[in-house]
């Protein structure tokens, strides 16, 4: 058989092993894995490189439509491709209107036409004002529903995202359980975090350490514990977003051991930045839950290596620079990290701490694809989409602002020496990013809908 593409001589991350093997691609799908596969129209030599499944980033904010001056599809998905991401799962907030019904998600689809460099799945929102319309988003094909039990949204904007109270969460989780949809939750105690934050502002405590102190670990743990129980009673599958503390992970592990259907994610910034670095970097490193101290970070690494965290995500949530101005307590909370997930975590987890390549592949791609039902994604296996990223190990570079593809070329990772590089990203058999050529093809990304899997 003649193939469209054969990738030769790379160390390929398979589901339970990594070995030097060739991959054949035909019609955008992985057709064969082995040696001496035959002829192809194109042959790529991946000698000395790690060939990973393209990253499935399960937590991305693209603020188009309505706030494309924060981040748009064109810039955001180019940054993703440059960072080795081939599929993103897009959050239902930051854009206006928030993605909370059929009309708003159709606006997303229209806004993205001709702009997607990578593939994208969508999450719907569970908010205080759409509980009777959740079925609309399920019918369109979202892969889950996101909600906040922490305070969120601009009360002065009618169609912005909104947090839910316990009653709204419970009723929404009941409906989502009936629909077979997971609920994803931002877990922080709203009232306590809000009051601690206001108290700090009144007293003039506005440093990074003060911000972290205003959102202590117990506020995350309490919220996780609460939504775990409510989701269990409601009969809904739960995914806990961006867990920032070992204690928070322990709550998920305990529930899982008791038989509850629950998963969790975390983000690179909780593993590679600490509060002292946050103080030095400033508002670019502000997020919620916040970046915590070094002891907390060490505990997170232990949980990651123990297999208690299901997937790693960017939580890419940028904004215009003026929203990061001023003191840390007032600045927008959100990190621009889409482009730096794979290389930073390959360096920190694999090269510096000895994580196995199969575990890396599961954390960056396979598990997220499984959690959200992306059946064609996340694995290098025959029949799956031919989505790959080439990683050059032990190849250090210093990230600069000019390297970034974001709408606003800022990130807390700028200035960091990263010990591995993404050299090529392939989506369904086509090179969408190359370290030498840039972006050689027009945007070919597609939306992935649940019912079309």
Swiss-Prot record:
Enzyme Commission code: 3.5.2.5
Modified residues (N6-carboxylysine): 146
Catalytic activity reported: (S)-allantoin + H2O = allantoate + H(+)
InterPro entries to which the protein is assigned, alphabetical: Allantoinase, Allantoinase_bact, Amidohydro-rel, DHOase/Allantoinase_Hydrolase, Metal-dep_hydrolase_composite, Metal_Hydrolase
Top-level taxon: Bacteria
CC cofactor: Zn(2+); Ni(2+); Co(2+); Mn(2+)
pH dependence: Optimum pH is 7.5-8.0. The optimal activity is at pH 8.8 for zinc-containing form and pH 9.0 for cobalt-containing form.
Post-translational modification: Carboxylation allows a single lysine to coordinate two zinc ions.
Swiss-Prot/TrEMBL keywords: Hydrolase, Metal-binding, Purine metabolism, Zinc
Pfam (any one): Amidohydro_1
Annotated thermal dependence: Optimum temperature is 40-45 degrees Celsius.
Protein residues bound to Zn(2+) 2: 146, 186, 242
Listed pathway(s): Nitrogen metabolism; (S)-allantoin degradation; allantoate from (S)-allantoin: step 1/1
Note: The zinc-containing form utilizes only the (S)-isomer of allantoin, whereas the cobalt-containing form prefers the (S)-isomer, but also hydrolyzes the (R)-isomer at about 1/10 the rate.
PANTHER family: ALLANTOINASE (PTHR43668:SF4)
Listed name of the protein: Allantoinase
Species of origin: Escherichia coli (strain K12)
Higher taxonomy: Bacteria, Pseudomonadati, Pseudomonadota, Gammaproteobacteria, Enterobacterales
């Amino acid at each position: 058989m003649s193939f469209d593409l054969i990738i030769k001589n790379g160390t390929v991350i398979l589901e339970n092993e990594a070995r030097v093997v060739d991959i054949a691609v035909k019609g955008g799908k992985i057709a064969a894995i082995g040696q001496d596969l035959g002829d192809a129209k194109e042959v790529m030599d991946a000698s000395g490189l790690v060939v990973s499944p393209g990253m499935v980033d399960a937590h991305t904010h693209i603020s188009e439509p309505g706030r494309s001056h924060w981040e748009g599809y064109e810039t955001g998905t180019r940054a993703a491709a440059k960072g080795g991401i081939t599929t993103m799962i897009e959050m239902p907030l930051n854009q206006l209107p928030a993605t909370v019904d059929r009309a708003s998600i159709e606006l997303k689809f229209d806004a993205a036409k001709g702009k997607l460099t990578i593939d994208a799945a969508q999450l719907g929102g569970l908010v205080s004002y759409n509980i009777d319309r959740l079925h609309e988003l399920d019918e369109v094909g979202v892969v889950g529903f996101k909600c906040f039990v922490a305070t969120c949204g601009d009360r002065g904007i009618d169609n912005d995202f909104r947090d839910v109270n316990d009653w709204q969460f419970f009723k929404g989780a009941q409906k989502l359980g009936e629909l077979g949809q997971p609920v994803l939750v931002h877990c922080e105690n709203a009232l306590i975090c809000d009051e601690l934050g206001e108290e700090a502002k009144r007293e003039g405590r506005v440093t990074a350490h003060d911000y972290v102190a205003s959102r202590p670990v117990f506020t995350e743990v309490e919220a996780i514990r609460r939504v775990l129980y409510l989701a269990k009673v409601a009969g809904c599958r739960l995914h806990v977003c961006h867990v920032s503390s070992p204690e928070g992970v322990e709550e998920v592990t305990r529930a899982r051991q008791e038989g509850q259907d629950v998963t969790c994610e975390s983000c690179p910034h909780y593993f590679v930045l600490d509060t002292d670095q946050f103080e030095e970097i400033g508002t670019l490193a502000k997020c919620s839950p916040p970046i915590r101290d070094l002891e907390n970070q060490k505990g997170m690494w232990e949980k990651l290596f123990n297999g208690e965290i299901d997937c790693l995500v960017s939580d890419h949530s940028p904004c215009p620079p003026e929203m990061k101005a001023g003191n840390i307590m007032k600045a927008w909370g959100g990190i621009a990290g889409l482009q730096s997930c794979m290389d930073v975590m390959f360096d920190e987890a694999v090269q510096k701490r000895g994580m196995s390549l199969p575990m890396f592949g599961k954390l960056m791609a396979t598990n997220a694809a499984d959690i959200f039902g992306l059946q064609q994604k996340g694995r290098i296996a025959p029949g799956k989409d031919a989505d790959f990223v080439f990683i050059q190990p032990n190849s250090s570079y210093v990230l600069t602002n000019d390297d970034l593809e974001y709408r606003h070329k800022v990130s807390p990772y700028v200035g960091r020496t990263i010990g591995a590089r993404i050299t090529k990203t392939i989506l369904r058999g086509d090179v969408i990013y190359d370290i030498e050529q840039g972006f050689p093809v027009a945007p070919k990304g597609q939306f992935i809908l649940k019912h079309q899997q």
